[in-house]
């Protein structure tokens, strides 16, 4: 892989640290406080669609669901092999982080009943939104550096559209979607770390020979 395609050394750690801090902050503020739960529920109830509209929107959720995103991520990783096995592995690692993290956190993090009308399980982060983020992360690792800006903008918009769809259908709260974006940051950072791993040793070995 050309050196100019490698990220700045600090970028992966900035993404991982920022995403982790964002996740923690969202959980503490939106889930563990009365005002946070009230705000989250108010946004959800304001944007939630009526039954007729929800029935029309539901097929879109299936069309862009986690299974479809996993298949697309696998295709992106295979395409990444053309740029080296570390690039393909990095794309896969970033996607796996995005796909697995929401399932673990939803089980591990409790949601206290502070402002909810009835006891509810924790739904932060959204698995559907994180699945879209997984595809974006894989693409951000695989595509050339010159194309990453466009992928980042379009990918962020795609995550936002999926998030709005989930809120409109009443499946997730706003904080769940924001948390998925943070998971995406962590996944991207992880993918970049894996992609860049061993590059220093390769350069040193080439120089020595």
Task: Please identify what each model-predicted range represents.
Residues 1-12, 170, 198-203:
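Cytoplasmic juxtamembrane interface segments
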Residues 2-119, 140-141:
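Hydrophobic alpha-helical bundle signature of multipass membrane enzymes
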């Amino acid at each position: 892989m050309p050196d100019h395609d490698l990220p700045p050394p600090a970028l992966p750690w900035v993404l991982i640290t920022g995403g982790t801090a964002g996740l923690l902050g969202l959980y503490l503020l939106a889930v563990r406080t009365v005002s946070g739960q009230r705000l989250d529920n108010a946004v959800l109830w304001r944007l939630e669609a009526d039954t007729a509209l929800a029935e029309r929107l539901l097929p879109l959720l299936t069309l862009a669901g986690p299974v479809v995103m996993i298949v697309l991520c696998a295709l992106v990783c295979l395409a990444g092999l053309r740029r080296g096995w570390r690039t393909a592995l990095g794309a896969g690692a970033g996607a796996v982080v995005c796909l697995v993290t929401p399932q673990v956190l939803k089980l591990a993090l409790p949601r206290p009943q502070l402002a909810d009308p009835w006891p509810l399980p924790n739904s932060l982060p959204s698995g559907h939104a994180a699945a879209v983020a997984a595809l974006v992360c894989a693409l951000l690792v695989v595509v050339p550096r010159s194309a990453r800006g466009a992928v980042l903008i379009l990918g962020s918009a795609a995550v936002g559209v999926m998030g709005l769809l989930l809120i409109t259908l009443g499946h997730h709260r706003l904080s769940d979607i924001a948390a998925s974006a943070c998971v995406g940051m962590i996944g991207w950072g992880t993918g970049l770390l894996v992609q860049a791993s061993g590059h220093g040793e390769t350069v040193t070995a080439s120089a020595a020979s």
